[in-house]
From Swiss-Prot:
Reaction(s) catalysed (UniProt annotation): Mo-molybdopterin + GTP + H(+) = Mo-molybdopterin guanine dinucleotide + diphosphate
Protein name: Probable molybdenum cofactor guanylyltransferase
Cofactor(s) the protein needs: Mg(2+)
UniProt GO MF annotations: GTP binding; metal ion binding; molybdenum cofactor guanylyltransferase activity
UniProt comment concerning the protein's domains: The N-terminal domain determines nucleotide recognition and specific binding, while the C-terminal domain determines the specific binding to the target protein.
Function as written in the Swiss-Prot or TrEMBL entry: Transfers a GMP moiety from GTP to Mo-molybdopterin (Mo-MPT) cofactor (Moco or molybdenum cofactor) to form Mo-molybdopterin guanine dinucleotide (Mo-MGD) cofactor.
List of residues binding Mg(2+): D100
GO CC annotations, alphabetized: cytoplasm
Annotated positions binding GTP: L9, A10, G11, K21, D69, D100
Length: 199
């Protein structure tokens, strides 16, 4: 079985939300606690990439390493967070999750990691017709491609995917719940989440 480590991205500024999303409460836990718990159902090695302003608070909530972006690429978006996690944890594959999808299911993570195949460099879900690169798995060899993009001041996940051999998987063939993929960017979306019954 391939070794898989988890990387949780909590380094954003949460400007639209108005406060750190990682620390927002839902169903008795903060978003970051919930996502780490879900990942721990599937894998042992997990690291959280945190913004410096909340690193200490996040570290008190969870029992996995909490680090910041590599200094040279600090604040350069999700690519910087992913490569920082790859440098911190040694694995063949890395499962990624942002901190603002608190209803993500361990069933879904198992389905994605179950698709891992060294013929590919990334396993990316497509949900309701949209690619979800921050809820995918990446091979360790992608690390050098991320460095190259960052050095060229290219930060988008789509640019990374365009340089990778990607296996796209659709949720249509599985029994998934749409609420698993609810992404919370605003207070309005948070209010909607609070009204959703957890599946």
């Amino acid at each position: 079985m391939k070794s898989v480590a988890g990387i949780v991205l909590a380094g954003g500024m949460s400007r639209r939300f108005g406060e750190p999303k990682a620390l927002v409460s839902w169903q008795g836990y903060t978003f970051i606690e919930r996502i780490v718990q879900v990942m721990q159902d599937v894998m042992q090695d997990i690291v959280v990439i945190s913004h410096a302003s909340i690193k200490e608070r996040v570290a008190h909530l969870i029992e996995v390493p909490v680090i910041e972006d590599i200094s040279f690429y600090k604040g350069e978006g999700p690519l910087a967070g992913i490569v920082s996690g790859m440098e911190h944890l040694e694995a063949e594959w890395y499962m990624i999750s942002p901190c603002d999808t608190p209803n993500i299911s361990s069933k879904w993570i198992k389905q994605i990691t179950g698709q891992i195949d060294d013929e590919y460099e990334a396993i990316i879900p497509i949900v309701e017709g949209r690619k979800q690169p921050l809820l995918g798995a990446y091979h360790k060899n992608v690390k050098e491609k991320i460095y190259k993009l960052l050095d060229e001041e290219k930060r988008s996940m789509e640019q990374l995917l365009s340089h990778c051999n990607v296996k796209y998987v659709t949720g249509d063939e599985w029994n998934i719940e749409k609420t698993w993929f609810v992404n919370v960017n605003t207070k309005e979306e948070y209010a909607e989440l609070l009204t959703c019954k957890k599946k």
